[in-house]
Amino acid sequence: MNNLLSMEHLSNEDIYELIQTACDYKSGKQTLPQFEGKFVSNLFFENSTRTKCSFEVAEQKLGLKEVNFETSTSSVQKGESLYDTCKTLESIGVDLLVIRHSQNAYYEELENLNIPIANAGDGSGQHPTQSLLDIMTIYEEYGSFEGLNILICGDIKNSRVARSNFISLISLGANVMFSSPDEWVDDSLDAPYVQIDDVIDQVDIVMLLRVQHERHGITGEANFEANDYHEQYGLTMDRYNKLKDKAIVMHPAPVNRGVEIDSELVEAPKARIFKQMTNGMYLRMSVINKLLSGKEA
């Protein structure tokens, strides 16, 4: 596997291999590989806590040395292009790039590079490692995906998580439904839109999405009322109590408590939000291993 850019580039076999390796790292069944003498640079052009820190911990556990990159102090501020920035890092011997960027499909500009790239999120396009860690979390709970009913609630149109998960979960055999305000519907994704209260007692997984304030613009924000959104699309205690006994609640985070989910439900028994974060570190180790080992996915 030369790069991890989009879930569309992964077969089901690739997905299972990556999550199984991550599960083996987590259980201790498989020894962590060490990449002593290898260098990685994390280029985050958008804010991040979980993804950035998770990659950093994963890299350190695998023996990688980080070449620090800060957008605010780099030559990007002087007008240097993304390609030239990445080509510079390749030229000085960096072995892996982890990139988050506000531009959809930014990686199309980097096709001439000879260095592995892990996409840590491109605009509202894709977020493959988030999708993979979500899949890992579901796999740990259910052992398979065939026939699972999954409800994804929220800002579908602007969510790279929704897009990545829809692509992968449908391919793996799950049934995916969306619930969203009309202005956040994404017609490019062929899934039914439902009212959350009509299906809340039937789903196996409720996947809540953060409201993407930074992508809405002035008009979108003017029309947003947190309380109204919570009442119509959020996971309230009443809705939580209607979930099936073995249903789980997921959220890619950061969580807007009291908007997407009642604050007291973030760590409720059915919630797997912090487990997702733990799994993310192991999953990203699996991805790094695949990219640096040169094995075919």
Curated annotation (Swiss-Prot):
Keyword Transferase: yes
A cellular component term, taken from the record's GO annotations: cytosol
Residues that, per the record, bind carbamoyl phosphate: R50, T51, R100, H127, Q130, A253, P254
Xref: InterPro entries: Asp/Orn_carbamoyltranf_P-bd, Asp/Orn_carbamoylTrfase, Asp/Orn_carbamoylTrfase_sf, Asp_carbamoyltransf, Asp_carbamoyltransf_Asp/Orn-bd
Lineage: Bacteria, Bacillati, Bacillota, Bacilli, Bacillales
Entry protein name: Aspartate carbamoyltransferase catalytic subunit
Sequence intervals crossing the membrane: none
Function: Catalyzes the condensation of carbamoyl phosphate and aspartate to form carbamoyl aspartate and inorganic phosphate, the committed step in the de novo pyrimidine nucleotide biosynthesis pathway.
Organism: Staphylococcus haemolyticus (strain JCSC1435)
Keywords: Pyrimidine biosynthesis, Transferase
